[in-house]
Amino acid sequence: MTFAVGQRWMSESENNLGLGLIVAIDRRTVTILFPASEEQRIYALNSAPLTRVLFQIGDEIAHHEGWKGNVLDILENNGVAFYLLKRQDNGEEITIQERDIAHQMTFSKPQDRLFTTQIDRNEHFTLRYQALTHQQAQFQSPLRGLRGIRAGLIPHQLHIAREVGQRTAPRVLLADEVGLGKTIEAGMILQQQLFAEKVERVLIIVPETLQHQWLVEMLRRFNLHFALFDEERCADFEDPASALWINPFNTESQIICALDWLCEKPKRVEQLLEAGFDMLIVDEAHHLGWSEHNPSLEYQLVEQLARQIPAVLLLTATPEQLGQESHFARLSLLDPDRFYDYQAFVQEQQQYQPVAEAVQSLLADKPLSAVEKNHISDLLSEQDVEPLLKVLDSQAHDEQKALARQELIDNLIDRHGTSRVLFRNTRQGVKGFPHRTYNQITLELPKQYNNAANVLAMLGEKGDNDSFYPEQMFQKLNPDARWWEFDPRLEWLITFLKNHREEKVLVICRHANTAIQLEQALREKEAIRAAVFHEKLSIVERDRAAAYFAQQEDGAQLLLSSSIGSEGRNFQFASHLVLFNLPDDPDLLEQCIGRLDRIGQRRDIQIHVPCFADTAQVVLARWYHEGLNAFEETCPMGMTLFEAHQTQLNKFLQNPTALEGFAEFVSLTRKQQHELKQALEKGRDRLLELNSNGGEQAQQLATDIAEQDGTTELVNFTLNLFDIIGVDQEDLGEKSIVITLASNMLVPDFPGLKEEGATVTFDRQLSLAREDVEFISWDHPLIRHGIDLITSGDIGKSAVSLLINKALPAGTLLLEMIYVVEAQAPKGLQLTRFLPPTPIRLLLDQKGNNLAEQVSFSALQKQLKPIGKNMANKVVKMVRPNIEQLVKLSEQKIVAQAQQIIHNAQQLADQTLSAELNRLTALQAVNKNIRQDEVDALDNIRSQSLAQLQQATWRLDSLRVIVSNKE
């Protein structure tokens, strides 16, 4: 080694010190300063573990003043290198000494890292190559964005999510019946849009009572971290004494807020509009009241936002038959240019009703009547419909007729008036739901409650709803009163639990205090294991309670929950629901039952309602059951009837022992409920349901995703990733493991893994049963961030290995190189669909022959052995000229392969986007719901995509030096 003051060197044993500078030399030692780490080392001259840092023509150098330049020429004076650089910022040519090079200078090219002793372990190189190949596969997977949800694979949900999620700036109304998973559909659409980088900033507006439900659903099911915004949070950003003004909505990119709050605070709406968002999601959109001359404040607020925000999802469970005018208004929010005239909309909808009836005949395999054929011909062109009708009327084979029938239905769906903006599935259309059985338990009202009611009435403090929550009423007089010592509901519950020891039971109370006190009473009286679940707990604490309830062995027999606390949580593994307090409106009742009655529930649901005789509880329970049939069936018209009859109902509730005329009132309600139900059934749009359901394609989609759950490939890659990065793993059994950050991690941080760690599983069903267990798939943030951590960093970029092969002469050199072909383009173009970062593997021998096809990566890997770092450095120094020569040769050999990959990507993009554009353009001629801006956007995407693919490049990503030995 020849040392000179001012030279730059790297430490072979301490790469993390950065770029070193020789500051002193004496007869036996050399002193090197490492400014980046503020360290100094003294080495023996004849055995210093150092590598000289010299740059080549064309290399990029960072100057300590912050600018960068490319090397044009290299000079040397007294052993010190001088570089002629061309600055990247202004084009000026300037000569610098090597001491002026930035001390934090890093070496990212694999050959630079190799020659500066930054050599990785063999398994790191393997992990990098696997990460690149998996990244390519996942970018091109049609299932990306659909697999990672922690929910059952429900075909109709997957169909809607894929259909809408792949659009540019989707604007749709999701109107599935209650319990069919609109929130999940919206989440999956959002997830795909985020994965494709079509959206980044998202605003969710919901009723105040549903804020936490959405927060929990987005986090637990989709790993999306939303922030709740209210007046207190916004006020924190306003300091009258400060000149600095911050828009609070710019501080987060994914926000949930309450509709009521925004209506009260117009200033916040202005700030929302100023902040700007890419997607708006509005739940309970049927609350956006509208009439032609008097739109509600809520409607006008959402209308303002929807005009500015490109993508809009409106969620509602209210069918248009309960308010055609409001239904039109919701569609108008999505596309005001299309839905601008209410009367024209009504006439158009009437046109589709006969067609929907004709579809019923097609589905039932019945011959079409002349009238039905005419209705179909009115909607489809003659050239589309005539050949198909001829097949149906002919003596053709059943298979031919089935194909013709399906094509006819598909054509009708494409041309349906609202099929692109409206999706609705019904329970009747989806099937697979359990039965619900109502069990009323009538108990005698304790005298203590009666006395408390009389005292409060005398004091003028008795509330209208006290009779529904007698335990709360009793504690108004004495907050410490132990109501559970005399309340017969508790004794009934204890007996019920003893008789159903093997069953899981969900008990819902109106208030958190009731749930807390019930748990205490059950523990003290009978040592019954119960979990408590309410809004005063943090999300983590609720997770623990839910997990305790979900455990089959040693878990809680029952979960005691407040009605608000249970929002957003579903417990399909339980089939017994106890309503300790009867909800005081039909929507709340359905929300409580909906915790168990969800798609995916496999057993019939038993609903138990303990209530006191001669009280408002019994009166309301009877009206719910006999009038609305709300316990045993979903009742979409429940709130409509409740609001229509609220005055009359309240009279009976306030005087529950004077029920003259109540039977007639219940009978009237039942009659109206039946009429509304029939109207809804008659108005069912089977064509719309067919489009929303997805049919066999949706079933196949669910099957395809299920086949990818927990594959050996995924499990092996994940565990290997954890091992190498430095994530500790503890096997818990039951197909789950606990992962935590190790103290000696390879990287400073692992995005997606919390400090306290996580419990994870590759089993979808286990993750559904236990809310504290995360479901690992290719879409999970840990896997996506882990792959990105490897491929975007320096881990595994250079390695040296020993090849044990007796057939090769000892010392034979092979160079394994991984090139990556990629396109740098705006995120929204989604070019990774056509050209993800694509690895190309070369394996060159000393003569420059490419052996990659003859020797696979895995076959070679099995013959390799690790080599110590000191020996690896010596090998690299010995064969450096050979390596440099082979790298140059590889640059020629890679061209043809890379260009072919780019050409294939261009063809795929052209075919895919042209087909989408042609179909959309053709449909636009017959379906007014296809917006011109949607067509223009797709045309623009096609042009930009092809242009950007033309600019695709390739680079050397990583390399491995392989030297053979006999043993």
From Swiss-Prot:
One of its GO terms (biological process) is regulation of DNA-templated transcription. Keywords: Activator, ATP-binding, DNA-binding, Helicase, Hydrolase, Nucleotide-binding, Transcription, Transcription regulation. Its EC number is 3.6.4.-. The keyword Nucleotide-binding applies. A motif (DEAH box) lies at residues 283-286. CDD domains: DEXDc_RapA (cd18011), SF2_C_SNF (cd18793). ATP binds at D176, E177, V178, G179, L180, G181, K182, T183. Residues 489-660 form the Helicase C-terminal domain. GO terms for molecular function: ATP binding; DNA binding; helicase activity; hydrolase activity, acting on acid anhydrides. InterPro entries: Helicase_ATP-bd, Helicase_C-like, Helicase_RapA, P-loop_NTPase, RapA_C, SNF2-like_sf, SNF2/RAD54-like_C, SNF2_N. SMART domains: DEXDc (SM00487), HELICc (SM00490). Transcription regulator that activates transcription by stimulating RNA polymerase (RNAP) recycling in case of stress conditions such as supercoiled DNA or high salt concentrations. Probably acts by releasing the RNAP, when it is trapped or immobilized on tightly supercoiled DNA. Does not activate transcription on linear DNA. Probably not involved in DNA repair. Belongs to the SNF2/RAD54 helicase family. RapA subfamily. PANTHER family: DNA ANNEALING HELICASE AND ENDONUCLEASE ZRANB3 FAMILY MEMBER, SWI_SNF-RELATED MATRIX-ASSOCIATED ACTIN-DEPENDENT REGULATOR OF CHROMATIN SUBFAMILY A-LIKE PROTEIN 1. HAMAP family: Helicase_RapA (MF_01821). This is RNA polymerase-associated protein RapA. It comes from Pasteurella multocida (strain Pm70).
